[in-house]
Amino acid sequence: MKIVIYFFLMFIVCFSCSKEQSLQMFPKPVENRKDLNNRFYQIDTLLIDTTLNTTFEGNMGVHNNQLYFIDRLFCTLHFFDSTGQICFQTLGIGRGPTETTIGQIYTHTFLSNGYLCLQGTTDDIHMFTPGYKIDYSKSYRKNRKRYRLGDPIGYDQFELYSMGYPLVCRSYKNSVFTNNRAEDPTFNYFETPDVFVQEFRNITEQRLDKKQTGRLLGRGMPDLYKGNSDTHYIFSSTFFDIDNDGNFYITYMADSLIYKYDKDYFPLYSFGFEGKSMDKNYESIHTVEEIHTKGILQYKTKGYYTWLEYIPELNYILRSYSKSKQEISDGLQIYENNVLIADIDVPKGFRPIGYIEPYLFSDAILNQDKMRMYVYRLKIK
């Protein structure tokens, strides 16, 4: 009987793997539409109140119709109204009821129930109530198995991956999701590109209700990345967001398409157009040393997609992109129901973070030397 059960389970596993391999994980657009009517838009700069005590290391976000800045080194959370004036500050380093011992905040996200999830540079996850009191009953450390270099490890094992860069963290129900990167010497896009583009898992799920790592989602990379690891390694990161129904919207730094998957990560369709005036003539990288020299310098000179944000209030998908060194602006695409309705010029560094009526806001532009913090806000009529 045990033998029968064993072979039955092996059949299910093999069938599931075969089914996944047979899926077209990166479908081509069946219908790609744009409706670029003349829309009036206005962009201005909003200076953020910097009387707060901050390291100017962190990110801006939108939560409950307020702007906030989370300081990753001081572990503080500052809320502002839509005019940039400070409302209140909470969190901090320590063992008090509204403090954390996480060390440094690597990433964070708010859940639909109002909880705040912090992830540290180690494997710690700290959960805070809507009143910003730490909830130790829901906090935990990720269980990461140890293995030595050369030990066999599957491509679908959590231990093979670290959190991506630029880092994305999203939530849906009782799970949070982060993008991945793989830097193991036996498995990475630079040194083992042929295997990587077939087997790379794009996203890791953390099951907060079970305090454990969940699914590794997405298998492989779009065709654009096949055979191009020398030029596309620097531009291989995954950006994504999740809508109210749990559907995933995925884009890659060098790929013009946006891929939609359901909550089980079944591929649905793709859409999207190339941004304007993007210089995608990437330079070849042949050594690890070149990655850290002329490789990363291309972030300032080449065209690539820099962020993707779903705006539930408007049912918009926003995708920002860098154009080139020669251009004086970056770009922002706005999609509604998969249709490109706007592709506009925005200031350099514009990355969308959310909406407070009537403005779309960018992430913070930080100037530590001048002790200044500001955001761009975009109004479309």
Predicted regions: what is each one?
Residues M10-C17:
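Hydrophobic h-region of N-terminal signal peptides that target proteins for export
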Residues C17-K381:
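Eukaryotic scaffold repeat domains enriched in small/polar residues
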Residues K2-F8:
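Sec-dependent signal peptide recognition
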